[in-house]
Amino acid sequence: MNITTQDKFEEMEIEKTLGLVRGSTIRTKNIGYDLIASLRTIVGGEIPEYTKMMDESREEALKRMYREAQRRGADAVVGVRFETSSILAGSAEFLCYGTAVKLKNNIQLNFK
């Protein structure tokens, strides 16, 4: 399935718009990560534990959006966006959304 942040594919024409698809996950911080993060704020630098959690969360939200698009019979998802928002103290929602479409002359370009 092709996925892009653009509103269309230069190489292909959209035949039918199937509607909004989304995927999300809510994650909470780990008390061990908080301790490490607190120490890192003293010396500065990246907090790799949180970076990994953020990457995994975005990937999970993307996979869930992808699966919803597949269930709808989409060939592609255009206009893909990511958002993050705080839900409760210490937890955040990672959201990925876009527009599922059917393409004329579907050619697979990128995402597997």
UniProtKB/Swiss-Prot annotation:
Disulfide links within the chain: none
SUPFAM superfamilies assigned: YbjQ-like
InterPro entries: UPF0145_dom_sf, UPF0145_YbjQ-like
Family: Belongs to the UPF0145 family.
PANTHER family attached to this UniProt entry: UPF0145 PROTEIN SCO3412, UPF0145 PROTEIN YBJQ
Name of protein: UPF0145 protein MmarC6_1828
